[in-house]
Every structure is written in structure tokens, then in C-alpha cells.
């Protein structure tokens, strides 16, 4: 029952609770002992010879197959009487085979008797409310596994006796890997299903017996014998129909293939529908499944988001629907509108799109996939609940249709007697009531399917003709003018240049068709933004950058809301446009409304990323890419919130700084694991943040000022931690396929670029107390522990406070600070008449120097000044302490906040931190006044 219970728990997480599950659970708890007593007290009987126990009689009243089995197999009723009290597992089935005999002579009969027992057992439990859907599908899956493995072992033994074991060229014994596909692979097998199999073996070679044949011949013979043993219809019936059409090249391909052949097929010929089929692939027999997974996973789960899968799945489903309609089988609950296949497609298309980037989606069972999609917000809770409930209803109905005659059918019955049976089996008073609920579920499934797979490009757009003739600038200009473009001629020429470009002309036909469907909508959404001309130009830059990646075009084509958000974003910020162009994988972030929620859940992100990074071990390159992708995604989410006006500059900087801390925290243990000469489990090592990261004022493009400290007496500690620091720096700043994580600056360490890369905590203290320059103590005012060993972080904070609270000669300090300020001013002297927000007198640097001077000059008397509280808070404290006028301190804080906001605005638009002097004249005045009070000159 464990797996059935797990399935119920998953069902609960989906947010729905089908009545039959509750009913089955309650019935199981209340009635199983009574049922067992009733069955065991009755002698084994056929349907006609004497009254049957009620559980069997009820099942037989619905299932003609059950009646036939009881009549033709005198042993079956007694077998059922001993087993109905609990689900059947592999141990029970294997024991049955062992008792019947599974040598080659008795194999076929034993397998068929096993199936008769298992199917009658599960249908009786199901129809009497003792089994839920999870138990039925699990039992049938286990039956397939047991019979396939038994068949494989018995028949292989016979072939080995005749030809010897198949061997690789180096002498390793080879095995056949039997791969279960479809519902068998997903552990979702129905009661009258065929089984989809693929046969694969690791390496070519020859057998090692006296009569030598190739490995291919050996495994081909084994495969053929297995199919016959399972699928042949004998006087005892059949075990499973076997479908081999999912193998490479289908019916025209060889029955078995080697790993090399399979990999080559995936690379050169694998089609989208085969990716869909291989999602559920699972090895039933054979040990070398890890090697097979390494071959199949890159084919199924692409490294990047693959929205082109939607079109491929749409085409596949359209073909299936045409077949169903052509055969007048609209009542097919599997392939028809609103059927099981549409639920599976809706779930699995997101596996194809996102599975390569989100390992959590690399699961097989449909309900498990829906649960993950709901947890990650890819589908809404309502959608997940309705699809899961419909899936449960349709799969239970599917089983009841098949219980009638053990036929592989999915069509609703065509006669009144069977209609009445189905209604009763589904717990409805009549067939009309049943159809009402069925239609409700199918309508919900179709609605959700159409929402996911509806094709916006099929609808003609009013601007299609303009784009088709885009090179005719004179025709396009008046249309663009009416749409609201300020420079219709310029916009028309941009469109004409794109349409006539070699890049556009050389696109593959299917990608160019997507771009043709997209461009009229781009023109339309850009026109709706405040600056349509600039928005269109930036959108075209983005589209040119992604034009060869059909998946991104498909995303924008498939999701109009994403296209509108792109237009709003790039129209509002040149920097955002450039960031999105550099990292187009972030387009996916525009689909999730939760990304506009302004409070990142850092704990959840930390846990999720740790799990993901651990699963990728030891693939360092992929770990680096994942960290970059996640960092870019989080930055982009903050950017969308920022542009939407949901974040202040201060709150944005807090979030960006927290994100950087998290990346440092995650990187450190990953890098440490890869240090071969490490001498302890956890490094006695800490990362100290300086500058904007230290002060929690990080911007979108800020580099990280960091220093590395260690506290470890081991003789090899310096060498080990130097290597660790080097690797961390490389991890952060290396360019990979996903970009870089951060630019780093390590020059604030003791002795700067000429100093050691890592410093012991004792040496750091000695340096700060005896050798550091005043400007290094200024930098220390904004430093803090960021990642690593918290004990070292606490020791650093004690040293920082000790140094900052040293009594200083105030005159000498003033002279040093002023000299450093003049040096910085000279280095950034510009000829612009515009005001430099950072470096000009009365700007940001002046405020920072004022605060640093006040801290260094007075912290020995007022230790509260050493808190890493931010510049505005420190100004307020200095005012409250009477070190500066409180009213002037507050005005300087307001000025500092304004300067940062203006600087942020400029950077979002890709501009230097230069503004018109009149815009900041009032804000400069209190800063210059405070400078005069503190330093004696403006």
C-alpha cells in the first residue's frame, strides 16, 4: 500500500479530492475484514454452480471477462479468496510463477495464468471500492515488470546455453536492456493495455560459445522469442500485446539496437514526437541503465527552453484528432476531444519545454508532472486540480470499459446493457447522469488544452499585409503614423531593413514563418507603449539577436502577454533591453505573474538551488551555468518589479545584495569539494564584502569588492585557501555559455594587488592596526561578513569595530580624508557642463566621505557609529549625537537618496551619471553646507 498511499498524498497536494478515493479508503478500512471472512468461508465456485461471495458476484455482474475466467479456471475463485484482502505486489506474483513453474516448457502457461489472476484480482478490488486508481495502475505495471523479467531470464538462459554469452570486444558480458515506454514506463499501465517496448544492448561483439553469432543476432533472437512468449494467443489466453513501433525507425528499423546506434539516431533523425515518447522511458530489465539515461536525457530534455515543442505537439495532436474524427470515434475517451491524451499532452509539453533546465520536471507519471507544474506556478492551482480530477475520472472509466471484455477499448459503449453497466460501475444512478459528469470533465480538459496549445498565429492580423510588403516604405509610413509612431519614416526603414536583411532571408522556412507571424504583433504592441519608436527599435534589436533560436520566437508568438511585457520592459529601459538581448533565455520569466511579487523568498531559493546543484554533482560546468541562469533570472525579476514601480532604489539594492550573498554562499562549498588537497570537511574560510556589496547598495551591474580571510593553523592552510580563493574568483567571473556571474575586485585586501590573495584572521588584525592607510579604514566602515564560516565572520566584525573605534588625531584624519577626496576628484575631473552625480562636489562621494570621516573621528566615543547601517542611518545618528546639525543631516540624507534614484534612472537608460545642474541644485546645497561645517571649506 505504500505506493498507493504516496499517490494519494500527491493527489492531496494537487488540491482536489475525488469522491471515489475517499469512498475507497473508507470502504477498505470498514469492510475488508468482513469481505475476507465472507470469501474465505465460501468454497471455490464458478458463476453458475453456486452463489459467489458478494465481492466476486458484484465484479462478475459488470465484467463478462470475469465471468468467463471464473467459469473456465476452476482454481481462480480460491486463488482470489486468498488474495483480495490486499494489493498484489511483485513478491506475490513471483511466488505464483515459482509455484507454477517457469522453465521454458511451462513459462507461457504460467505467465497467462498469472495474468488471469492479477486482472481478476484488481478489477474485483476496484469495482468493490477497495482499490483506487494508483493501486490499479501500479498492480498492472508490476505485472508487466514481473512477466517481462521472467521471460527475459528464462529465454536468455536457453540462448546462452546454445551460443554462449554475448561479449564486448574487451570480453565484458553483455545484456539486453528492455525499455518500457508509454504508460508502462510511467507506471500508469491500464488493465487491457498493450506494452510498448524497445530493446537495446550496450556494445557490438560476438557470443563466447562454440557456435558463435553476433551480439546483434543473439539479442534479436532473444527479442523475438520474448515477444512471442508474451503476445501469442494460446488456449490460456495472452499476457500482453507487444508494440515495438517506438524503436528507432519504427517497423522499418531493426528489432534491437546498440547504444551507439541509438545515440546516432537521436542526433541525426530523432523527431519531436519521439522526444515526447521517451519522457516515460524506463528500463525494466538490464543493469546498465545509467549509460542509457546519459544517451537519452540530452535528446529528451534540451539544455535551453524549447517552446518550439508546442508547435510539434500541436501538430501531433491534430493528426490524432483527424484520425479519430475520420473513423467517427468522437466518443473515444483517450484520443477524442477532452480525453486522456490531451491531459498528457498538456502536462508533458512543459516537460519538453523546461525539463532540461528544471530537473524536477524529469518525472514520468502524469499526476506527478501536474503536481510539479502547480508547485512551480507554471499552471494555476485551478487548472492543475481540474486536470487531475478529470484524469482520475477518465482513467477509472477507461478501466471499466476494459473490464467488460478485457478489450483494449476507449470507446463509450453502444448498447443499453453496457451503458447501464458502465454507469453502475462508475457509481451513477443512470447513464444520463454519468454522461453529464463526463462531459463536464472533457469540456474542462479541452478548455485547458486549447489555452496551452491554441495557435495565435492562425488568426489573421491586420498588419500582416504591411509586414509582407515591409520593403515598401512609402506604403508602411501612413500605417505607422496612424498607429501613433512619432517617426513613421524611421520605423518603416527599420522594418524594411529587417525584412530585406540577409539574416532574415537565410532563416530556415519554419523559423521565418514564425518571425512573419510575430512581427505584425511586435509593431502593434510597440505602438501601445509611451515611446513607440524607441520600443520598436529595441524590439527589433532583440528579435535580430534571437532570430535563429526558433524556440524564443515561438514563445513570443505563443504567449501574447509575454510579448506585451517585452515591449513594456525594453521601452522603459535601454539597459533592460540590452540585458534581455544578452540573456534571451529570460523571456520565460515574463510568463509568470508571480515574478511581480516584490518579496523574494531567499530561503526557498536557497533550498531549491542547493538541491539542483547537488543533483548536478560532479558536473562543474553545468553547476556554473545553473548559478548564472538563476542569478540572471532573479535579477530580471527584480528588474521587472523595478520598472513596474514596485521597488524603491534602497529596497532594490537590498535584494541585489542579498542575491549576491546567496550566490557566494552557494559557490563556496561547491568549489571546496573540488579542491583535491583539502584537509578538512568544511573550510575555515570567510568572504568579506566591501564597497557597494558591503554597504548593501549593489546595483544591476556592480562588481563585487571582496576579501578572503581564513583561520586555520594547519601548515598547508595558506596553500589550500589560496587555491580556494582562486577557484571562487574563477567561478564567479569566468565567461561560460550562460555568461558571467559577477565581475570581482580583490584589490581591497591587505597590501592590495601586491598582497596575498588570502589573509589569516590574525594577520588581518595586525595589518589593520599597524599598517593600513586611512583610506583602507574608510573602506572598512562599509565592510561586512558575506559568506563562509560564521565564526570567522564574527571575528572579523570584532576586528572591524576595534579598528574603527581607535582614537585618532582629528586634524591628521581631516587632512588625510581631504587629500584622498582631492585625489579622487582630480582622477574624475570632466569637461562636461552636466553634473556628475557621483564625483562632482556636493554629490554622492562627498556624502560618503563625510560619513566615513565622522565614523573614524568619533567612533571611539560613540561606538554606535560602527554599525553597518547604511549612509542615511549613519547621518541621522551623527545628527542625534550632536556631531552635525540634525536638520542638515536629514536634508543630506534626502539628497543622498535623490542622487541614488537619479543615478539609477540614468543607468536603466544606458546613460552616464550626468544630469542637468538645475535638476540637482537644491539637493547639492545641504551637502556642500555640511562639508563646509565639517571640513571648513566647500
Curated annotation (Swiss-Prot):
Region (Adenylyl removase): 1-457
CDD domains registered for this protein in UniProt: NT_GlnE_GlnD_like (cd05401)
Classification via Pfam families: GlnD_UR_UTase, GlnE
GO MF term list: [glutamate-ammonia-ligase] adenylyltransferase activity; [glutamine synthetase]-adenylyl-L-tyrosine phosphorylase activity; ATP binding; magnesium ion binding
Region (Adenylyl transferase): 460-938
EC number(s) from the headed UniProt entry: 2.7.7.89, 2.7.7.42
Cofactor(s) named in the record: Mg(2+)
UniProt keyword terms in alphabetical order: ATP-binding, Magnesium, Multifunctional enzyme, Nucleotide-binding, Nucleotidyltransferase, Transferase
GO BP terms in the entry: regulation of glutamine family amino acid metabolic process
GO cellular component, one term: cytosol
Enzyme class name: transferase
Stored SUPFAM superfamilies: Nucleotidyltransferase, Nucleotidyltransferase substrate binding subunit/domain
Catalytic activity: [glutamine synthetase]-O(4)-(5'-adenylyl)-L-tyrosine + phosphate = [glutamine synthetase]-L-tyrosine + ADP; [glutamine synthetase]-L-tyrosine + ATP = [glutamine synthetase]-O(4)-(5'-adenylyl)-L-tyrosine + diphosphate
Biological role: Involved in the regulation of glutamine synthetase GlnA, a key enzyme in the process to assimilate ammonia. When cellular nitrogen levels are high, the C-terminal adenylyl transferase (AT) inactivates GlnA by covalent transfer of an adenylyl group from ATP to specific tyrosine residue of GlnA, thus reducing its activity. Conversely, when nitrogen levels are low, the N-terminal adenylyl removase (AR) activates GlnA by removing the adenylyl group by phosphorolysis, increasing its activity.
Assigned protein family: Belongs to the GlnE family.
Protein name per its UniProtKB record: Bifunctional glutamine synthetase adenylyltransferase/adenylyl-removing enzyme
Native source organism of the sequence: Aromatoleum aromaticum (strain DSM 19018 / LMG 30748 / EbN1)
Amino acid at each position: 500500500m505504500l505506493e498507493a498511499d504516496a499517490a494519494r498524498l500527491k493527489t492531496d497536494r494537487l488540491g482536489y479530492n475525488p469522491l471515489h478515493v475517499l469512498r475507497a479508503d473508507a470502504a477498505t478500512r470498514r469492510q475488508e475484514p468482513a469481505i475476507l471472512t465472507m470469501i474465505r468461508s465460501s468454497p471455490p465456485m464458478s458463476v453458475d454452480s453456486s452463489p459467489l461471495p458478494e465481492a466476486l458476484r458484484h465484479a462478475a455482474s459488470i465484467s463478462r471477462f470475469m465471468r468467463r475466467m471464473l467459469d473456465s479456471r476452476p482454481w481462480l475463485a480460491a486463488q482470489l479468496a486468498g488474495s483480495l484482502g490486499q494489493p498484489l505486489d511483485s513478491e506475490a506474483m513471483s511466488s505464483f510463477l515459482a509455484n507454477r513453474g517457469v522453465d521454458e516448457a511451462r513459462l507461457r502457461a504460467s505467465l497467462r495464468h498469472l495474468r488471469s489472476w492479477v486482472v481478476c484480482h484488481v478489477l474485483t478490488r476496484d469495482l468493490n471500492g477497495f482499490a483506487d486508481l494508483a493501486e490499479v495502475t501500479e498492480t498492472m505495471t508490476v505485472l508487466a515488470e514481473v512477466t517481462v523479467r521472467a521471460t527475459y531470464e528464462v529465454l536468455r538462459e536457453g540462448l546462452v546455453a546454445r551460443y554462449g554469452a554475448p561479449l564486448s570486444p574487451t570480453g565484458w558480458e553483455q545484456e539486453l536492456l528492455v525499455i518500457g515506454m508509454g504508460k508502462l514506463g510511467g507506471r500508469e499501465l491500464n488493465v487491457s493495455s498493450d506494452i510498448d517496448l524497445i530493446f537495446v544492448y550496450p556494445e557490438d561483439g560476438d557470443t563466447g560459445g562454440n557456435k558463435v553469432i553476433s551480439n546483434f543476432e543473439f539479442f534479436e533472437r532473444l527479442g523475438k522469442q520474448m515477444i512471442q512468449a508474451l503476445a501469442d494467443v494460446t488456449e490460456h489466453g495472452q499476457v500482453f500485446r507487444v508494440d515495438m513501433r517506438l524503436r528507432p525507425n519504427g517497423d522499418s528499423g531493426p528489432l534491437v539496437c546498440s547504444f551507439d546506434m541509438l545515440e546516432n539516431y537521436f542526433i541525426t533523425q530523432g523527431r519531436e514526437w519521439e522526444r515526447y515518447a521517451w519522457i516515460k522511458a524506463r528500463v525494466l530489465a538490464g543493469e546498465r541503465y545509467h549509460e542509457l539515461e546519459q544517451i537519452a536525457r540530452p535528446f529528451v530534455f534540451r539544455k535551453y527552453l524549447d517552446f518550439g515543442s508546442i508547435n510539434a505537439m500541436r501538430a501531433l495532436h491534430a493528426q490524432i484528432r483527424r484520425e479519430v474524427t475520420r473513423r467517427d470515434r468522437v466518443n473515444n475517451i483517450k484520443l477524442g476531444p477532452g480525453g486522456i491524451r490531451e491531459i498528457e499532452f498538456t502536462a508533458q509539453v512543459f516537460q519538453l519545454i523546461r525539463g532540461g533546465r528544471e530537473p524536477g520536471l524529469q518525472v514520468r507519471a502524469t499526476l506527478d508532472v501536474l503536481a510539479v507544474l502547480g508547485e512551480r506556478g507554471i499552471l494555476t492551482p485551478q487548472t492543475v486540480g481540474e486536470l487531475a480530477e478529470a484524469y482520475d475520472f477518465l482513467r477509472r472509466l477507461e478501466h471499466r470499459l476494459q473490464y467488460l471484455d478485457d478489450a483494449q477499448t476507449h470507446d463509450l459503449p453502444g448498447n443499453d446493457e453496457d451503458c447501464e453497466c458502465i454507469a453502475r460501475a462508475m457509481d451513477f444512478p443512470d447513464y444520463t447522469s454519468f454522461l453529464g459528469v463526463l462531459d463536464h470533465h472533457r469540456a474542462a480538459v479541452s478548455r485547458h488544452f486549447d489555452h496551452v496549445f491554441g495557435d495565435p498565429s492562425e488568426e489573421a492580423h491586420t498588419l500582416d499585409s504591411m509586414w509582407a510588403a515591409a520593403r515598401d516604405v512609402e506604403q508602411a509610413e501612413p500605417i505607422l503614423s496612424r498607429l501613433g509612431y512619432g517617426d513613421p519614416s524611421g520605423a518603416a526603414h527599420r522594418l524594411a531593413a529587417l525584412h530585406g536583411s540577409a539574416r532574415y532571408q537565410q532563416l530556415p522556412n519554419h523559423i521565418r514563418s514564425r518571425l512573419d507571424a510575430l512581427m505584425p504583433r511586435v509593431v502593434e504592441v510597440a505602438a501601445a507603449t509611451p515611446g513607440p519608436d524607441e520600443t520598436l527599435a529595441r524590439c527589433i534589436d532583440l528579435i535580430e539577436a534571437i532570430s535563429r533560436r526558433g524556440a524564443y520566437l515561438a514563445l513570443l508568438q505563443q504567449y501574447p502577454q509575454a510579448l506585451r511585457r517585452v515591449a513594456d520592459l525594453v521601452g522603459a529601459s535601454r539597459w533592460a533591453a540590452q540585458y534581455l538581448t544578452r540573456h534571451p533565455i529570460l523571456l520565460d520569466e515574463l510568463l509568470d505573474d508571480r515574478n511581480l511579487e516584490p518579496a523574494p523568498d531567499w530561503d526557498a531559493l536557497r533550498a531549491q538551488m542547493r538541491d539542483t546543484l547537488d543533483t548536478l554533482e560532479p558536473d562543474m560546468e553545468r553547476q556554473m551555468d545553473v548559478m548564472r541562469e538563476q542569478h540572471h533570472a532573479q535579477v530580471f525579476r527584480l528588474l521587472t518589479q523595478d520598472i513596474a514601480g514596485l521597488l524603491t532604489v534602497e529596497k532594490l539594492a537590498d535584494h541585489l545584495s542579498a542575491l549576491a550573498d546567496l550566490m557566494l554562499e552557494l559557490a563556496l562549498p561547491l568549489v571546496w569539494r573540488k579542491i583535491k588537497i583539502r584537509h578538512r570537511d568544511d573550510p575555515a574560510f570567510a568572504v568579506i564584502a566591501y564597497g557597494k556589496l558591503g554597504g548593501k547598495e549593489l546595483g544591476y551591474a556592480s562588481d563585487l569588492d571582496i576579501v578572503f580571510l581564513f583561520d586555520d593553523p594547519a601548515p598547508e592552510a595558506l596553500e589550500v585557501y589560496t587555491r580556494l580563493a582562486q577557484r571562487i574568483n574563477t567561478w564567479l567571473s569566468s565567461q561560460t555559455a550562460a555568461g558571467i556571474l559577477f565581475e570581482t575586485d580583490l584589490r581591497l585586501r591587505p597590501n592590495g594587488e601586491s598582497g596575498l590573495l588570502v589573509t589569516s584572521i590574525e594577520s588581518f588584525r595586525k595589518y589593520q592596526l599597524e599598517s593600513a592607510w586611512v583610506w583602507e579604514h574608510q573602506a572598512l566602515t562599509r565592510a561586512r561578513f558575506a559568506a563562509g564560516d560564521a565564526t570567522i565572520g564574527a571575528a572579523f566584525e570584532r576586528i572591524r569595530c576595534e579598528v574603527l573605534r581607535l582614537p585618532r588625531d582629528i586634524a591628521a584624519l581631516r587632512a588625510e580624508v581631504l587629500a584622498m577626496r582631492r585625489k579622487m576628484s582630480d582622477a574624475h575631473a570632466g569637461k562636461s557642463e552636466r553634473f556628475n552625480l557621483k564625483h562632482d562636489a556636493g554629490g554622492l562621494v562627498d556624502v560618503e566621505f563625510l560619513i566615513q570621516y565622522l565614523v573614524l573621528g568619533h567612533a571611539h566615543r560613540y561606538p554606535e557609529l560602527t554599525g553597518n547601517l547604511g549612509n542615511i542611518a549613519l547621518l541621522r545618528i551623527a545628527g542625534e549625537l550632536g556631531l552635525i546639525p540634525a536638520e542638515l543631516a536629514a536634508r543630506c540624507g534626502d539628497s543622498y537618496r535623490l542622487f541614488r534614484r537619479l543615478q539609477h534612472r540614468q543607468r536603466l537608460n544606458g546613460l552616464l551619471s550626468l544630469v542637468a545642474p538645475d535638476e540637482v541644485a537644491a539637493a547639492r546645497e545641504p551637502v556642500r553646507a555640511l562639508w563646509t561645517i565639517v571640513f571648513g571649506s566647500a
